[in-house]
Swiss-Prot record:
May play a role in signal transduction pathways that involve calcium as a second messenger. Functions in abscisic acid (ABA) regulation of guard cell S-type anion- and Ca(2+)-permeable channels and stomatal closure. It comes from the Eukaryota. Its main location: cytoplasm. PANTHER family: SERINE/THREONINE-PROTEIN KINASE. A lipid is attached at residue 2 (N-myristoyl glycine). The active site is at 202 (proton acceptor). This is Calcium-dependent protein kinase 3. It is an enzyme of class 2 (transferase). InterPro entries: CDPK_Ser/Thr_kinases, EF-hand-dom_pair, EF_Hand_1_Ca_BS, EF_hand_dom, Kinase-like_dom_sf, Prot_kinase_dom, Protein_kinase_ATP_BS, Ser/Thr_kinase_AS. Expressed in both guard cells and mesophyll cells. It catalyses: L-seryl-[protein] + ATP = O-phospho-L-seryl-[protein] + ADP + H(+); L-threonyl-[protein] + ATP = O-phospho-L-threonyl-[protein] + ADP + H(+). Ca(2+) 2 binds at residues 428, 430, 432, 434, 439. Residues 1-73 are annotated as: Disordered.
Length: 529
């Protein structure tokens, strides 16, 4: 998921004078009614200055339609380098200031993708909120916002220390105390946001990066694209967030800032066990598990973990948001405090193994689904093919979000805007903001087709180029390059996690198990000696 679903209420942003810190999902359907909280250029236009050197503008310059202030070419000030990451709307690049030579990150959002009024308001609000929260040790610093004829460019502090899970896995040794330290930094972000009238709404491990590779580097929250301003008592109805981390009240469309605590609690559960607390074969299954809300502390490694760790997880994942701890109460919990009771005894290696698998598995599965889609018979996909043709109104072979939004209701579909966003997010494998024919078929074909033996064997044969009966690292690398879906590190991780007999290759049995199973416990349990 990791996307937006609808804003029924967004409170007005606090006045700009309150910008000092006091210490402290799913998709985006938005109703046609009045939206508050991101009215236009006021905050955005006045607060986005570039780093190093002045930005001169004249009154004759044309105002950009997104930020509502004079347009400027970001490339006049910054030299663009390699791509750092890719999201639903934009691409993040490493850029260098031409005068100061300072390296920063630039999130570049093509304005052609911001066709819907609410998408434009989301970008404006992201800029407002990042300026509003600037200066906090654990929040990435927004240094400036530029708009030219083609894109909005957000210049941000460069985080070179890698993602949360990457750091944990690369260190090898890991303890409750390390998990407590990471969780404390995340909850400090939540506390700061809430005390300044901001709800994050998309807390997940991928949205936290380390500033540097230094051992004591701070952890930084990096993505505020779904965040909103709120006032005490405000309730929101839009379905936003990311599947594993979304709170039950968000799924029920009646929630407040307590939903951020739930998401942080899910991350803590993963930090301690390597797997999410609520699991399903697909998004619907995950949501069903969340709505049931049954926490299980009987499986490994929970019996070996401290009572304090389990107590905090329980209190952050209370089903009723009124019973959940606040961010301030979490920070005062004896287990998480800096001088607290969390043990520095290393956790079982199986925790790291499960964490690696949770991170790596989806990439190979998505590629295999695309291969299956390529090889389905005309009879099997005739209905889906006709649906794609009717959605692709300009006959260019791709379906945009706007084409989905306007086309699905015409097909008699009762699909909600939230589900349309979900379909786009799930289907758009290469992250270009549109769905091609194969991506569409891959995302919409029924699960029973995936589990048919002939389809699985066809997919396996696609990867196994030399018909040796194994998928090697070289063969996986070729496939991932074809679909633009990963780097050398991802390839090694996939081999390591799917290859249960540890011979450096993936055999057919291992491939089928990976495709059919959603339970991340299965492989690590087989690995135990």
């Amino acid at each position: 998921m990791g996307h937006r679903h609808s804003k029924s209420k967004s409170s007005d942003p606090p006045p700009s004078s309150s910008s000092s810190s006091s210490g402290n999902v799913v998709h985006h359907v938005k109703p046609a009614g009045e939206r508050r909280g991101s009215s236009g250029s006021g905050t955005v236009g006045s607060s986005g200055s570039g780093t190093g050197g002045s930005r001169s503008t004249t009154s004759t310059q044309q105002n950009g339609r997104i930020l509502g202030r004079p347009m400027e070419e970001v490339r006049r000030t910054y030299e663009f380098g390699r791509e750092l990451g890719r999201g639903q709307f934009g691409v993040t690049y490493l850029v260098t200031h031409k005068e100061t030579k300072q390296q920063v990150a630039c999130k570049s959002i093509p304005t052609r993708r911001l066709v819907h009024k609410d998408d434009i308001e989301d970008v404006r609000r992201e800029v407002q909120i990042m300026h509003h929260l600037s200066g906090h040790r654990n929040i990435v610093d927004l240094k400036g916002a530029y708009e030219d004829r083609h894109s909005v460019n957000l210049i941000m502090e460069l985080c070179e220390g890698g993602e949360l899970f990457d750091r944990i896995i690369s260190k090898g040794l890991y303890s409750e105390r390390a998990a407590a330290d990471l969780c404390r930094q995340m909850v400090m972000v939540v506390h700061s946001c809430h005390s300044m009238g901001v709800m994050h709404r998309d807390l997940k491990p991928e949205n936290f990066l380390f500033l540097s590779k230094d051992e004591n580097s701070p952890l930084k929250a990096t993505d505020f694209g779904l965040s909103v301003f709120f006032k005490p008592g405000d309730k929101f109805k839009d379905l936003v967030g990311s599947a594993y981390y979304v709170a039950p009240e968000v799924l029920k469309r009646n929630y407040g800032p307590e939903a951020d605590i739930w998401s942080a609690g899910v991350i803590l559960y993963i930090l301690l066990s390597g797997v999410p607390p609520f699991w399903g074969e697909n998004e619907t299954g995950i949501f069903d598990a969340i709505l049931q809300g049954q926490l299980d502390f009987s499986a490994d490694p929970w019996p070996a973990l401290s009572d304090g760790a389990k107590d905090l997880v329980r209190k952050m994942l209370k089903y009723d948001p009124k019973d959940r701890l606040t961010a301030a109460e979490v920070l005062n919990h004896p287990w998480i405090r800096e001088d607290g009771e969390a043990s520095d005894k290393p956790l079982d290696n199986a925790v790291l193994s499960r964490m690696k698998q949770f991170r790596a598995m989806n990439k190979l599965k998505k590629m295999a689904l695309k291969v299956i889609a390529e090889n389905l018979s005309e009879e099997e996909i005739i209905g889906l093919k006709e649906m794609f043709k009717s959605l692709d109104t300009d006959n260019n072979g791709i379906v945009t979000l706007e084409e989905l939004r306007t086309g699905l209701p015409k097909l008699g579909s009762k699909i909600s805007e939230a589900e349309i966003r979900q379909l786009m997010e799930a289907a758009d494998m290469d992250g270009d903001g549109s769905i091609d024919y194969l991506e569409f078929i891959s995302a919409t074909m029924h699960m029973n087709r995936i589990e048919r033996e002939d389809h699985l064997y066809t997919a396996f044969q696609f990867f196994d180029n030399d018909n040796s009966g194994y998928i090697t690292m070289e063969e996986l690398e070729l496939a991932m390059k074809k679909y633009n879906m990963g780097d050398d590190k991802s390839i090694k991780e996939i081999i390591a996690e799917v290859d249960t007999d540890r011979d450096g290759k993936i055999n057919y049995e291992e491939f089928v198990a990976m495709m059919k199973k959603g339970n991340p416990e299965l492989v690590p349990n087989r690995r135990r000696m």
